[in-house]
Amino acid sequence: QVLPALAVVFTVTLLMSVMLWVLKAVYGTPVSQFGVYLQSHIRFNTYIGLTSMALIFGAAGMQVFAMIIAFVIPLVNVLSVLGFSQGQGLSYKNIAWSVAKNPLILACLVGIIFNFSGMHLLESMSQSLKLVAGMSLPLGLLCVGAALQFNALKYAGRALILNTFGRLIFVPILAYVGCLLFGLATFETMIVVVFFSLPTASAAYVLTKYFQGDSQLMAAIISLQTLCFGLTFPLWMWFLQ
């Protein structure tokens, strides 16, 4: 059941990226802003995603979500870096290394290996990890709150609005259509649409700053998307019900 969901996620992510690159060519968007636009539409906040999946779908939903992010995180990281690559003298070896050492990717890969190999942890180690896991989501949400930059919302404009609601409304619609075309079951459809309704990752600001992109706009988009998610997410859940 995970493979069709992965197919939709990859298709929508790549399609959204291609659409943005086409718009960049048409409107001559500067690289410093294009990287922001791209991240705003394809990256996602893992902590909010895990919390949402745990509360709404339980263990089954978290398992599917974990499989999705394990394969999608490398893709969105590479695409995000490529969004800033023009004229940056980018080393593809450095891209591969930065993706390979991403702790979220490593954690997901280890989990997948254990899941498919049938190996089991010692009971004492398993209990310890369960305690850590119980703390991880609340701590992750605290980090999300701490990363919000409300002053950046003064950086208002059409780009802020378009990149906020493009992510929270247009991309989930695209995902829902993709689920219908791929014939996904209701459960997987809900997970995929919820995945694409998540706000962009707080780490997008760090990458934007590193490549000397429009970090002020990125901070504003992250903050507004995260705030508006509280309004759009219930609407999507109502629609999917």
Language-model-derived ranges and their functions:
Residues Q1-Q241:
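Alpha-helical transmembrane segments of multi-pass small-molecule/ion transporters
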